[in-house]
C-alpha cells in the first residue's frame, strides 16, 4: 500500500531506525532523512554512520547530516544550508526520534502538520535523554512510548498517542529498548495513517503532576555504591547494560558487573565484601541484602558467566570491593 502523506524523518540510533523502517515499509514517501554526523566509534575510533543513515542510504533515501539547525549557533553555514534544504523539500509532517539536535521554532513550524516526536516513556514521566535507563533504575513496573506534538520545551508537547509496555524483572536497557523501539514503530505508522485519513490527531496537554526528568547517563554512574540495598544495585546493573555497565573496584582493578540479582545477605559482613562464591555467581554484601553477580568482565577481557570468569580470575571470600567514593 502506498500513501500520499510525505514524511521528513529525523533520527539517529537504532531506536529511530526501527521507526524509519516501519514508515518506509508502510508505504509513506520519505523525501528527506536528517541524522547526526558520522562519529568515531569502536576500538579503532573510525568514523561510523548512524543506524538511521545506514538504513536510509541502503534504500536510496536523501540524507542530510547537519551538525546544527540553529542559524545563530556554532555552525551557522551548515545550519543555513540544512534549513534551506528543509524549506525546499515538499513535505507534510516531520517525525523525530532520538535525533539528538535541538529543533528551532522555524523547523517546528515548517511542516503543515508540525513535528511529531517518538519518546520512549509514558510522559510526563521521564522527560529527557535517558528514559529507558531511568525507568529500570527506578524500579518502574511499566513504561511505554508516547507520540508528542513537539513544541519549544524539553519533551513538553501535547500527547497524541501512547503504548504501554511492561518492564520484566530481567529486562535490561538493551532488551527494553528493543521492545520500545518496536512499539514506537507500530505507533507512529498507526498515527500517520490516521493523520492522512482525518487530517488531524487529537492532542492532550501533558498533566502538570507526575513530571520527572531522565538525566543523561554518565560514565561516573557505573560505580556501584555497596551501601545501597541489593535490590537497587541489581536494578542499576540492568539499567546500565549496555552502557556504561555496573562497575566495582577490587584490589585496584575495575571489574564490570553485567548481570546480578538480589539475594538474602549476612548482617555481619561489611558492604562490598565477597561472602560467597559458587557456580551460580559471586555474592557481595550490600547495605541491605546481598548482590549475586552472575556475569563479570575484567579489564581488557570479555563478558563472561561467573563460572568461566572465576576459572581465569579467581576471587576469594573476604575480599572487599572498594567504596564507590574511593574507587
From Swiss-Prot:
Which parts of the sequence bind (6S)-5,6,7,8-tetrahydrofolate? 121-124
Q: What is its EC number?
A: 2.1.2.9
Q: Which Pfam families match?
A: Formyl_trans_C (PF02911), Formyl_trans_N (PF00551)
Key words, A-Z = Protein biosynthesis, Transferase
Mind telling me which CDD domains this protein's record contains?
FMT_core_Met-tRNA-FMT_N (cd08646), Met_tRNA_FMT_C (cd08704)
Reaction(s) catalysed by this chain, per the record, are: L-methionyl-tRNA(fMet) + (6R)-10-formyltetrahydrofolate = N-formyl-L-methionyl-tRNA(fMet) + (6S)-5,6,7,8-tetrahydrofolate + H(+)
**A molecular-function term among this protein's GO annotations:** methionyl-tRNA formyltransferase activity
Q: What PROSITE patterns does UniProt report for this protein, alphabetically?
A: GART
Give the matching SUPFAM superfamilies.
Answer: FMT C-terminal domain-like (SSF50486), Formyltransferase (SSF53328)
Superkingdom as given in the UniProt entry: Bacteria
Q: What is one GO cellular-component annotation here?
A: cytosol
User: HAMAP family per the record?
Assistant: Formyl_trans
- Which family does this protein fall into? Belongs to the Fmt family.
Please give the function described in this protein's UniProt entry.
Attaches a formyl group to the free amino group of methionyl-tRNA(fMet). The formyl group appears to play a dual role in the initiator identity of N-formylmethionyl-tRNA by promoting its recognition by IF2 and preventing the misappropriation of this tRNA by the elongation apparatus.
Protein name (record)? Methionyl-tRNA formyltransferase
Q: Which organism encodes this protein? A: Burkholderia pseudomallei (strain K96243)
Amino acid at each position: 500500500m502506498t500513501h500520499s502523506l510525505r514524511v521528513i524523518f529525523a533520527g539517529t540510533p537504532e531506536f529511530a531506525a526501527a521507526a524509519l523502517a516501519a514508515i518506509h515499509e508502510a508505504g509513506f514517501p520519505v523525501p528527506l532523512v536528517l541524522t547526526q554526523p558520522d562519529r568515531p566509534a569502536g576500538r579503532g575510533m573510525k568514523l561510523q554512520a548512524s543506524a538511521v543513515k545506514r538504513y536510509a542510504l541502503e534504500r536510496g533515501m536523501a540524507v542530510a547530516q547537519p551538525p546544527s539547525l540553529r542559524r545563530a549557533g556554532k555552525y551557522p553555514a551548515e545550519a543555513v544550508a540544512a534549513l534551506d534544504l528543509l524549506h525546499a523539500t515538499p513535505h507534510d509532517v516531520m517525525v523525530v526520534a532520538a535525533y539528538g539536535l535541538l529543533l528551532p521554532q522555524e523547523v517546528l513550524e515548517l511542516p503543515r502538520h508540525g513535528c511529531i516526536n517518538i519518546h520512549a516513556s509514558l510522559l510526563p514521566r521521564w522527560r529527557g535523554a535517558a528514559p529507558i535507563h531511568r525507568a529500570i533504575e527506578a524500579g518502574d513496573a511499566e513504561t511505554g512510548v508516547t507520540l508528542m506534538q513537539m513544541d519549544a520545551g524539553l519533551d513538553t508537547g501535547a500527547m497524541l498517542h501512547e503504548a504501554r509496555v511492561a518492564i520484566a524483572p530481567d529486562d535490561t536497557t538493551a532488551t527494553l529498548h528493543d521492545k520500545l523501539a518496536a512499539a514506537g514503530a507500530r505507533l507512529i505508522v498507526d498515527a500517520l495513517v490516521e493523520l492522512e485519513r482525518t487530517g488531524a490527531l487529537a492532542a492532550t496537554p501533558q498533566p502538570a503532576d507526575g513530571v520527572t526528568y531522565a538525566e543523561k547517563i554518565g560514565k561516573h554512574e557505573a560505580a556501584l555504591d555497596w551501601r545501597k540495598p541489593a535490590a537497587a544495585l541489581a536494578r542499576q546493573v540492568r539499567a546500565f547494560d549496555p552502557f556504561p555497565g555496573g562497575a566495582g573496584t577490587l584490589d585496584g582493578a575495575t571489574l564490570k558487573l553485567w548481570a546480578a540479582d538480589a539475594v538474602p545477605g549476612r548482617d555481619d559482613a561489611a558492604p562490598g565484601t565477597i561472602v560467597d562464591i559458587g557456580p551460580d555467581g559471586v555474592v557481595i554484601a550490600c547495605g541491605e541484602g546481598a548482590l549475586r553477580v552472575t556475569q563479570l568482565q575484567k579489564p581488557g577481557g570479555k563478558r563472561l558467566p561467573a563460572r568461566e570468569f572465576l576459572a581465569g580470575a579467581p576471587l576469594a571470600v573476604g575480599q572487599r570491593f572498594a567504596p564507590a567514593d574511593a574507587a
